[in-house]
Amino acid sequence: MSKNFNHEDFSHWIFDLDNTLYPASVNLFGQINTKMSNYIMKLVNVDQETAEKMRAEYWEKYGTSLAGLMQNYEIDPKDFLKVVHDIDFSVLPKDLDLLDALNNLPGRKLVYTNGTVPYAREVLKYRGLLSVFNEIYGIEDAGYIPKPFPEAFEIIFSKAKIVPNSSAMFEDEERNLVVPFKLGLKTILVSNVKSNEKYVNYSIKHLSDFLRRITSNPLK
């Protein structure tokens, strides 16, 4: 990088929720995927295999399966999200190490998820991280327009008063970092699969380790 990553230069830290603020190995989203497939089976009257294919195709094309269902079947997003977020959160372990690392970051800490705010609050509560975040934004705050679409980021970043060149975005999905990078944010992919995309400034496996590193010494 041409400039060091000095944590003192940042005023806003924006974190995705699912598979970013908890490990993907927990497979919380596996529960949600099952609920979504069941919803589609009943809505469209198709078998499980077809429903799972539709769910995946809608996610790829529309950003979320919900967005695809809204576009093609005009469903009530509130009803859908209430159903698919009725899951067992107790599989989420508390993470005091991550809590400590987040507490050491200066500035404001935000969660921005394609889930809902109530869902995000439940996840953070079970992880023991709820108290550390200043603001939480969900898909409902963007009029149900999901990441990775530019309109979604424009709406949320405007509401949160994000200053791009002094903000960082953490995500587990590469495609959700394209717009933040173009806007001037520092972008960090949290994934076991390393990224070499130019719009990913840092590709990391362990969030808490990375946060400790940047609060100890500036990164290049």
State where each predicted segment sits:
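Substrate-recognition element of Asp-dependent hydrolases with the DxDx(T/V) motif
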Residues: D79-P93, L99-R127, F133-I139
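A generic structural signal for short
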Residues: S25, M54-R55, R108-K109, D141-A142, ...
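N-terminal helical cap/lid subdomain that shapes the substrate entry/recognition surface
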Residues: K3-F15, T20-D97, P118
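Short glycine/serine/threonine/alanine-rich loop segments
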Residues: V46, I75, G107, I162, ...
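Well-formed, non-transmembrane alpha-helical positions, independent of function
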Residues: G68, A101-N104, V179
